[in-house]
Amino acid sequence: SPEGLPLKCLMNSAGELMWDVWAGGQISGEAKENATGSLNAIFGGECDANGPKKYTTGVGDENNWDYIVPLGEMNFGHVTPVDHFYMYYPKDADQRAPGSFSITSPADGAIIDVQDFRKMNNWPYPDFRIVITHSCDLYTVLIHIGALVGAAARAEAEMPADGHWVGNIPVKAGEIIGDRSQAEKFDFSTFATDAKVDLINPLSYLAGESWKPYTANPLDYFPADVTKAYEAKMIRTTKPVGGTIFYDIDGTAQGVWFVKDTNGYAGLQGQRSVRSETGFNSRGYWDTHLAIAPHHVDTAMFVYSMGDFGGQPVQFVTKGNIDPSTVKAGGAPVVVDLLPFKYTTPDGQAMDIFSPVKDYKLAPQTDIAGSLAFQVNADGSMTVEKRPGKDAASFTGFSADALTYVR
């Protein structure tokens, strides 16, 4: 990168290849400090210290979206809470003419990084990731953009064979830069200096998704009228309506964990995403991830999200809805029964998750899929044993299958 940080083609949170800072390379102490110290060091390129610190318009017309999913979803290979909104199109969007669903820059700035997943992942259809710097303190990331439009098209014209373009294309607030993805949705993230959270162990993100501490709620950065319009499309009404990804509580089981000595968020990059017989993505960098946190819509329910439970990433709730913040260092091992769940409307009617309603609820099922034993240790680590097919009552103590997780 321009800041002297080595890059490597890594797998991102969607199981796609992309370029990111690589901790496996020779990183100096200064570069390591930079990687956790500023957005410009993370995203690279030039930035304007005096540029916008807030958005001045939206990323598109809210009337074009069916609904918006807030920050914090944990879903299959997205084991830890995701750092982006999902902007869902109507189900007939693939039948609309090109140009029907435009994506715009939310403030003045410059496109500094574009990745072409068609080249990087050998996909048969166009799919782009765009990074926009609005200032040294405000960045926008858009993923699964189906076509680059206007000035942004220059990046595609100049795209290297490796699928990663770096440069500087000035854009204005409201300028159309993309068209509807051929997928059902696109991802939208905001990263801001004033949103930075002091993580328990920020170095766990140095090797992958090093922007995580700067994850902002995009609704906090729009003009009031845009925020109001976007909130109306949100499937969550609990405040903050835009959700959050930050659930770590030191000294408890709640939050995000990684198997010790597996390179933090980046995980074991030798594992490529494959499809299991059940159709789920299995065996990826997320194998070593664990998150125990509130659901992103039904926030009263705690989700136990694991990257490798019997060979695939899964999310469960627990019998009794055990609150992980009550499991603290110094206590005895806790063992919970893991339950699959379905979805209902707020009044208890069955609901299709692909046609969600506001404030839907999780409905735990009765069949026990297995159990999870865990104990928070005095040094801040956690001993964890995943027990597919075994209920909590059968636990007699940790076995050789137990692993140590760290923040």
Kindly give the residue locations of the regions a language model identified.
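Surface-exposed, glycine-biased beta-strand/turn segments
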Residues: 27-128, 136, 172-173, 215-345
